[in-house]
Amino acid sequence: MADQKIRIRLKAFDHRLIDRSASEIVETAKRTGAQVRGPIPLPTKIERYTILVSPHADKDARDQYETRTHKRVLDIVDPNDKTVDALMKLELAAGVDVQIKLT
């Protein structure tokens, strides 16, 4: 697998969960002898929602909610077969979305 790179993108609503998952991936990759770049934090996407509290006339009574989507990128340079097998067997938290791209 010479001159190949695995790019892993992580997304989660909880920053502690995504940092814990990223450290597990880095630890697993380094244990198998691969070189790791990252985790690189990407900008947090903040979505805000404003909802009218009153069912009828009061436009002044509103509640505001927001969701924050945290993102991280990891690059694993020159992975070997042991690295790929270890990453496939790795169990991450349920709240983390993982996208893996092999280039």
Curated annotation (Swiss-Prot):
Signal peptide: none annotated. GO terms for cellular component: ribonucleoprotein complex; ribosome. One of its GO terms (biological process) is translation. The keyword Ribosomal protein applies. InterPro entries: Ribosomal_uS10, Ribosomal_uS10_CS, Ribosomal_uS10_dom, Ribosomal_uS10_dom_sf. SUPFAM superfamilies: Ribosomal protein S10. Involved in the binding of tRNA to the ribosomes. Part of the 30S ribosomal subunit. Belongs to the universal ribosomal protein uS10 family. This is Small ribosomal subunit protein uS10. The gene is rpsJ.
